[in-house]
Regions:
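Long, highly charged, low-complexity intrinsically disordered interaction regions
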Residues: 244-346, 351-374
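Divalent-cation
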Residues: 2-276
């Protein structure tokens, strides 16, 4: 991943979803395989520097003095040649046109910056004052830095990013293997009605660990551009179904609201996301994020699923029907004990669908028990 200054703590939201989305879009724009990245590499090879604003509005216009207006089509060779001039370049936000060249950027000097070089100080201040990314190419240090709302990323060679990405992918594979184990155990315990809060917490913990490492790899994919195609395919295969499973587990086990404690599915997911990596390793802390007390007694207490997760595995069963089945029967054990006639009592469930649900649940129950004991 590109080097990051002032990163937020793991598991915590940093500069905000807006800035994060803008940073991802900017990283994608300068990724290998793009015309902009090709132009930046040409600038480095030519032993020159550059300062490029990726967007133009009134705020950027007010900071520009001198130079000249071009409004020509963007190409990597034009970028390279125009960066030989003193001054900055201003592109459109879609990086299809070069609006201005040779301009001097004069941002508010009172804006704090910890950068030292003139070009980098200007890039940092401009990025904080406007809503567009700014790219600074250092001639002396031979590096490309990207600034978004004051956050700085130094772009690296694909080989360095791929090395870390492959390590992260190996970690994801181990995490996913362990997740499959604990999820399989949970399914078998659900059939036998032997689930404890500890079992649920272990699955929620593993799902969150997988989600986080997958998010990290997804950032590598963005930064790698065309070089990350194979990595993207591997990631998609490994995390298929993980995000829906995460929500289904919470929906199955989030405690019923009480006078002292109440937590929605969305709140539980937010609480899990807010945990640091250290907190995520503590089962009592994860249990509290789900809405339980987190005491040793609570971890060993019995709980019963509502049935969302198992019903979601029944083929061709719409979400609306799943909601009605859960609402009608109130729990997985009653669903498992329901006959075809009982299932038909639910609005929208005819004889064919009732048989499909009955057979699907029976097959899932048999396979879960076999996987646990064979």
């Amino acid at each position: 991943m590109a080097a990051k200054d002032g990163a937020s703590a793991p598991g915590k939201s940093g500069a905000g979803s807006g800035s994060e989305a803008l940073m991802r879009a900017a990283l994608s724009a300068v990724a290998p395989g793009t015309a902009l990245r090709d132009g930046l590499e040409r600038i480095l090879r030519g032993n020159t520097g550059g300062l490029i604003v990726l967007g133009l509005d009134k705020a950027v216009d007010s900071m520009c003095t001198g130079g000249f207006v071009l409004d020509v089509e963007f190409t990597s060779t034009r970028l390279r040649e125009l960066c030989k001039l003193d001054g900055a370049l201003v592109l459109d936000k879609d990086i299809t046109k070069i609006h201005r060249a040779g301009v001097q950027l004069v941002p508010d000097a009172s804006i704090h910056t910890e950068e030292t070089g003139t070009r980098h100080r200007t890039a940092d201040r401009v990025s904080k004052q406007c809503n567009f990314p700014v790219v600074s190419v250092s001639q002396s240090m031979r590096l490309i830095a990207l600034y978004v709302h004051g956050e700085r990323r130094v772009l690296e060679e694909s080989a360095a990013i791929l090395s870390r990405a492959n390590q992260a992918l190996a970690t994801l594979e181990r995490y996913k293997l362990r997740l499959d184990e604990v999820a399989g155990t949970l399914s078998a315990l659900e059939i036998e009605d032997l689930v404890t809060v500890r079992d649920v917490t272990a699955v929620a913990q593993r799902l969150e660990m997988v989600r986080r490492i997958a998010t990290e790899i997804a950032e590598y994919v963005v930064e790698l551009g065309t070089d990350g195609r194979l990595l993207s395919l591997q990631l998609d295969e490994l995390i298929a179904g993980v995000e829906p499973e995460r929500e289904l587990v919470i929906r199955d086990y989030v405690p019923e609201p009480t006078a002292k404690r109440s937590r929605t599915v969305a709140e539980a997911l937010t609480e899990l996301d807010a945990l640091t990596h250290t907190e995520l390793l503590e089962l009592p802390v994860v249990a509290r994020a789900l809405g339980y007390s987190g005491s040793p007694e609570t971890l060993d207490s019995a709980v019963s699923p509502r049935g969302y997760r198992l019903l979601a595995k029944v083929p061709r069963l719409p979400g609306a029907i799943i909601e009605r089945l859960v609402e009608h029967f109130g729990g997985l054990q009653k669903l498992l004990a329901a006959s075809v006639d009982d299932l038909q009592a639910v609005d929208g469930v005819g004889e064919a669908r009732a048989r499909s649900v009955r057979e699907g649940l029976s097959r899932l129950a048999e396979s879960s028990i076999l996987e646990r004991y064979v």
